[in-house]
A protein has these predicted regions:
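Thiamine diphosphate
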Residues: 1-145
């Protein structure tokens, strides 16, 4: 499940995971209010797993709220604890070097899914970014980041 910019990275991850015979339900929230809880509950019931991707920090995040509600209302549907991929709880870095590990990317999503599925996949091997700098989403991006 994702929202905002991280959905682009999630789409990349899902495409790479499909090549490894791992099928994912990707829910793009598009809005965080109202949240389509029935869609989320159905996905958790179907897959037994939940990874929530958030472009906000971990503490006080929408991801935390979604995981909390799933744990309260659908905990018996989960095969394992849910996972949250969000930004760390500190200010966003402004130097190129510090941004390398700050923002979540498709590779991080693949690694989280791999761990959840007890598979030995490496996101960096499955995603070929070529010569695109780590802080540029893709070749079509023309603005500052």
């Amino acid at each position: 499940m994702s929202m905002s910019y991280i959905t682009i990275e999630a789409l990349r991850a899902v495409e790479a995971l499909e090549k490894e015979d791992i099928l994912c339900d990707l829910i793009d929230l598009r809005t965080i209010m109202p949240i389509d809880w029935d869609l989320i509950f159905d996905s958790v019931q179907k897959t037994g797993r939940l990874i929530v991707l958030d472009t906000g920090v971990e503490t006080g995040s929408i991801a935390g709220e979604i995981i909390s509600r799933i744990c309260m209302e659908r905990c018996d549907s989960l095969k394992q604890p849910p996972k949250r991929l969000a930004l760390p709880d500190f200010p966003a870095p402004t130097s190129l070097t510090l941004t390398r590990e700050f923002y979540k990317r498709a590779e991080d999503i693949i690694d989280a899914v791999s761990k959840m599925m007890t598979r030995n996949l490496c996101g960096k091997k499955l995603i070929d970014r070529g010569d695109i700098p780590h802080d540029v989403p893709d070749k079509s991006f023309k603005g500052p980041f």
